[in-house]
From Swiss-Prot:
Disulfide bonds: C6-C127, C30-C115, C64-C80, C76-C94
GO molecular function, one term: lysozyme activity
Protein's UniProt keywords contain Hydrolase: yes
Residue ranges annotated for the C-type lysozyme domain, each copy included: 1-129
Protein name from the UniProt record: Lysozyme C
The gene coding this protein: LYZ
The protein's enzyme class: hydrolase
Function recorded in the entry: Lysozymes have primarily a bacteriolytic function; those in tissues and body fluids are associated with the monocyte-macrophage system and enhance the activity of immunoagents.
Localization annotation: Secreted
Classification via PANTHER family: LYSOZYME C
Organism listed in the record: Numida meleagris (Helmeted guineafowl)
Note: Lysozyme C is capable of both hydrolysis and transglycosylation; it also shows a slight esterase activity. It acts rapidly on both peptide-substituted and unsubstituted peptidoglycan, and slowly on chitin oligosaccharides.
Reactions the enzyme catalyzes: Hydrolysis of (1->4)-beta-linkages between N-acetylmuramic acid and N-acetyl-D-glucosamine residues in a peptidoglycan and between N-acetyl-D-glucosamine residues in chitodextrins
EC number, UniProt record: 3.2.1.17
Length: 129
């Protein structure tokens, strides 16, 4: 599913990401824009053999199990396919675990490159939330 910007913002808010660990909703929407272009089906293979999945491009080496990543830790205890659903419950719950891991949203390269230090309110502008 390719989410609309405000549609994804609303879903993220519903799942408790707004101000989770101090990160406003705009940060999450911005990260999703640059990680996946709001596409829940997005996958990207990494040079280490792991794959990133879903709107927030969550990695199979650490966070989910795709059955093909050597030494996968699966710290969110989910199949990676759950991160590709149109229902973002698994993505939101796993993202909360990731952002609590010590580096905050710096865990997302796209967030560091495109969102960090910017006015992320633009990402929820005009949305009825």
């Amino acid at each position: 599913k390719v989410f609309g910007r405000c549609e994804l913002a609303a879903a993220m808010k519903r799942h408790g990401l707004d101000n989770y660990r101090g990160y406003s909703l705009g940060n999450w929407v911005c990260a999703a824009k640059f990680e996946s272009n709001f596409n829940s089906q997005a996958t990207n293979r990494n040079t280490d053999g792991s794959t990133d999945y879903g709107v927030l491009q969550i990695n199979s080496r650490w966070w989910c199990n795709d059955g093909r990543t050597p030494g996968s830790r699966n710290l969110c205890n989910i199949p990676c396919s759950a991160l590709q659903s149109s229902d973002i419950t698994a993505t939101a719950n796993c993202a909360k675990k990731i952002v609590s891991d010590g580096n905050g949203m710096n865990a997302w390269v796209a967030w560091r490159k495109h969102c960090k230090g910017t006015d992320v309110r633009v990402w929820i502008k005009g949305c009825r939330l």
